From Swiss-Prot:
Disulfide bonds: none annotated. Residues 147-167 are annotated as: Disordered. It is found in: Cytoplasm. The keyword RNA-binding does not apply. InterPro entries: Ribosome_recyc_fac, Ribosome_recyc_fac_dom, RRF_sf. This is Ribosome-recycling factor. PANTHER family: MITOCHONDRIAL RIBOSOME RECYCLING FACTOR PSEUDO 1, RIBOSOME RECYCLING FACTOR. GO terms for molecular function: ribosomal large subunit binding.
Amino acid sequence: MTVAEVLADARDRMGKAVEAVKEDFGSVRTGRANPALFQKVMVEYYGSPTPLGQLASMNNPEARTLIVTPYDKTALKEIEKALVNVPNLSATVGNDGEMVRLTLPELTEDRRKEFVKIVRGKAEEGRVSVRNIRRRSKDELDALKGEVGDDEVARGEKELESLTKTHTDQVDDALKRKETELLEV
C-alpha cells in the first residue's frame, strides 16, 4: 500500500463517518415533522419487517403534521400500528382509510435540551470515529517507513492531520446546525 492509498482510504472512511453522524442527526426530532424521522420505522408487511420508506410516500403539509400514504392500501393498519409504537414520539396518529395523519406535539424546552444532549453525544461518537480512523491510518503510514522515504511518510501524516481536522470540523458544523434547529421555537 502506498501513502496515497492510505490517505485515499482514510478520506473515504472519514467521509462515511461524517455522513453517518448527519444521518443520525436526522433521526433526532426537531419541532417539525420530518419524513426522514420515519424512513426506517419497521412495519410488519406480509410477515416480514419492512422499512416504512419502502411502503409509503411521506410529506408534511404543515410544520408538525406528516401524511403517510401507503402504496398498498392493505398495509394501512400495519403502518398505523408501527407509527403508534414508535418510542419517544408521543404523536397523535389518525387513519382515515386512505392515509395515516401524524400530528407531533410542540416540543417543551426541557425536551429540546434533552435532544441537544443526545445530538452532542452522537457528534462526539462521530469525532471519536474520525480519530480512530486517523489512528489506524497513522499506524499504516508508520508501517510504510521502511518501504518509502521518511519525508513522504511525514507529508502523509501532515495530510492525515489536515483530513482529520476537516472532517471533525464538518461534524462540528453539522452539530451547530442541528442545535440551532432544535432550540428554534
